[in-house]
């Protein structure tokens, strides 16, 4: 078991090294899009399932509260937090619509959808992206593996941040790091700090 634990650390480190080569430009572009969205008085909606739901909530909490610097709250909503809404939609319609119906109600042109799926194939995330596109929203997608069906929904104005791994746990670990990079870039751009 000790070797397996050590291997997990080694694999995680290697995946992050690979991601450090592949992802910085797309992370920077996504952060710039989010900054412009927020400067325009718009908001960011975030969604995911399971661990990715946790990531969506983590991102929203960092924006609504703070990341590492004191600053005003920023508008972000995790669509996975309202159990009454989610269970009503899943019961009355379908689980695939739990995020899309919220986007039709809350999403506005100029808002951003942060869509998170390690496989890129989650049905309710795909429906959420379709709803966002119909509302003239921009999409930032956090994916892994081959990007799945989500990759096919991306337009020129959207950004896919695809972790170079086929292992769900490694993808999730990098997704968290990407979220922290996004939050850091948003904060440092909107609220520059004296680095001295």
From Swiss-Prot:
Details of cofactor binding: Binds 1 zinc ion per subunit.
Q: Please list the residue ranges annotated as the SIS domain.
A: 34-196
One Pfam family from the record: SIS_2
Record pathway: Carbohydrate biosynthesis; D-glycero-D-manno-heptose 7-phosphate biosynthesis; D-glycero-alpha-D-manno-heptose 7-phosphate and D-glycero-beta-D-manno-heptose 7-phosphate from sedoheptulose 7-phosphate: step 1/1
For the keyword Zinc, the answer is yes
Q: Which gene encodes it?
A: gmhA
Family, according to the entry, reads as follows: Belongs to the SIS family. GmhA subfamily.
UniProt GO cellular component terms: cytoplasm
A biological process (GO) of this protein is: D-glycero-D-manno-heptose 7-phosphate biosynthetic process
* Protein name as it appears in the record: Phosphoheptose isomerase
Native source species: Shewanella denitrificans (strain OS217 / ATCC BAA-1090 / DSM 15013)
